[in-house]
Amino acid sequence: MEDAGEDPTTFAAHSLPSDPRLLATVTNAYLGTRVFHDTLHVSGVYNGAGGDTHRAMLPSPLNVRLEAPAGMGEQLTETFALDTNTGSFLHTLEGPRFRASQCIYAHRTLPHVLAFRVSIARLAPGSGPITLLLRSAFSPESPDLDLHQGPDFQGARYLYGHTLTPEQPGGPQQEVHMLWTPAPPDLTLGEGEEARTWDFLTAVGGSQAEAQACLTEALQLQARGALYTAHAQAWAQLWVECGLDVVGPLQLRQALRGSLYYLLSALPQPKAPGYICHGLSPGGLSNGSREECYWGHVFWDQDLWMFPSILMFHPEAARAILEYRIRTLDGALENAQNLGYQGAKFAWESADSGLEVCPEDIYGVQEVHVNGAVVLAFELYYHTTQDLQLFREAGGWDVVRAVAEFWCSRVEWSPREEKYHLRGVMSPDEYHSGVNNSVYTNVLVQNSLRFAAALAQDLGLPIPSQWLAVADKIKVPFDVEQNFHPEFDGYEPGEVVKQADVVLLGYPVPFSLSPDVRRKNLEIYEAVTSPQGPAMTWSMFAVGWMELKDAVRARGLLDRSFANMAEPFKVWTENADGSGAVNFLTGMGGFLQAVVFGCTGFRVTRAGVTFDPVCLSGISRVSVSGIFYQGNKLNFSFSEDSVTVEVTARAGPWAPHLEAELWPSQSRLSLLPGHKVSFPRSAGRIQMSPPKLPGSSSSEFPGRTFSDVRDPLQSPLWVTLGSSSPTESLTVDPASE
């Protein structure tokens, strides 16, 4: 979808931003750095005790800059570009005689490998040598690691050591082992040579053997001339399998592409074996050193702001994120015990252990709404995948149950109101602390408890009576006279709030609201939300107005929702003035949701994925490809007049067949694999087709969820459909059904 011939996938400039925090990042699921930065980080490697724990700084061999020697006597054009198609950062110098380029990347299929390559090509006749400089400031030192130099391995230097201070007393001091091929001070295209390329590798592991094995694998690919090709092809395949685009303004398209690129960069390649998630922090793996981007800690940002879009495009990574919460459950149980409560209280700021590592106690004690965000992520995952194995055998049920137990021990009964109260909390609006009955938090309590009860029933487990009693009787503040939800007991309209809070009710938090109340909540809080608040706020106001079909207000807020994106590499800052966390995945996640869930109207429910597309001015078409739902991959696109849905792949014969139920006609259209189905734009739901009648031919398993037959995410056997012949299209007028 090209707009006026512009490419929304490559972000180029002739100079770098003056603020080095805004340089592009290159990351994969294990390693991350900013280009031309002296530090790299390793996933899950933290140094420092308690609230001082932060991502350990490892010196980066990629901190090398290509330069022309002084006095070369040529006018050179310098270009810097982030190519999202290949997950690569390119620095190019071009003159009349030559073109030299440096390509920096975090390898997509070898996550323990970072690399850069330098190429020099002759452009004009002549045979003289051409020499370029490589400026490096590498120093084998770190304030966080006790590092030592070891023997070279296959031409690579070796640096190893361990963190200085464990997160908790007696905890592990994590090992880091790094091998790298050092860059020389200059490179020369020899006399008579037309072109040449040099590769420089960095391999990092948790042991010497792991680092050596990873470097060896990379060197083998390099010897075959396939090192960069394997990386670029993996990115190309990823973009084939998932995508998000609009026919609309270039800046919006670039914002969508950049946000999805940075989020996908934090995740493993689909079907990658052995991936262990150590959580996603607001600034990503490229940031998080001491006193930087919240020290690399994991917040509710992961579960509420990043997770929903990840789930739709990459359910394996979504499961790995939930496994991080399962793995840190012991820490959450201890957090609750330390506060005098039962069950689990997930840390407001979490690192390796799951114990609270927030430097300021007030947030760890009061922002209990993180628990609700964690359980909501488990709920969305369950409805999307029906992966009962995660809950039956892999610890998911333990998390959901422990949070339910925490809520029941944390609430207090009010005889006067005959309601359960939740006192002394802080909601997302951090301008107000120690409040009673945050409406956002209390609705999350309801949601957590009701999901816990429903899941217990599906698992054949007893349901404690207190769970539904608290869910039904917890106070949900509502002002009948003014027809809106006060943020908490005693909130007065007009009080300034920090960020989206009450407006999260309805989406992303499931909660039934009349259109009038939804509108009033939006109007009241939009007027008093601080313009200095974090980036994800305005995307949720945009979603709210999309729900109400107010396209004008929604479009203005959608544009405002990516105003924190900095040029030229589309790196986000937490706050509009450029302060706060950078490469702010939280803000990107909120913005992506504004399109993936706002424009489409997608809502993941127990019955299916509902849709209700809305067209905004200046956007004539929205396309979302590679959506996952119960073992099926779908493409969903719409314009002013029509909606098109196509099932493009199935994970196996156990994946249920789907249909689209249109509203209000109740027409049901079969979504046959390999066929496009188009219908006039309307609301509806994508859902499982009813089981075949007895005796009919079917590959489905009537009466059983597909997770009963096979774990849907363990080595899925994706079958791509329609690749050998043109995809058939079926256009349906529901009125004729």
From Swiss-Prot:
Alphabetical list of InterPro entries matching this protein: 6-hairpin_glycosidase_sf, 6hp_glycosidase-like_sf, Glyco_hydro_65_M
GO BP annotations, alphabetical order: carbohydrate metabolic process
Pfam families to which the protein is assigned, alphabetical: Glyco_hydro_65m
Catalytic function, reaction form: (5R)-5-O-[alpha-D-glucosyl-(1->2)-beta-D-galactosyl]-5-hydroxy-L-lysyl-[collagen] + H2O = (5R)-5-O-(beta-D-galactosyl)-5-hydroxy-L-lysyl-[collagen] + D-glucose
Gene3D superfamilies: 1.50.10.10, Maltose phosphorylase, domain 3
Residues of the active site: E430 (proton donor)
Top class in the EC scheme: hydrolase
Gene Ontology MF term list: protein-glucosylgalactosylhydroxylysine glucosidase activity
Biased composition (Polar residues): 721-730
Keywords from the named record: Glycosidase, Hydrolase
Keyword hit for Hydrolase: yes
Mutagenesis or variant effect for D301 to E/N: Abolishes catalytic activity
Enzyme Commission no: 3.2.1.107
Residues annotated for substrate binding in this entry: W300, D301, K498, Q499
One cellular-component annotation, GO: cytosol
Cysteines joined through disulfide linkages: none
Region ranges (Disordered): 681-737
Stated name of the protein: Protein-glucosylgalactosylhydroxylysine glucosidase
Species, as recorded: Homo sapiens
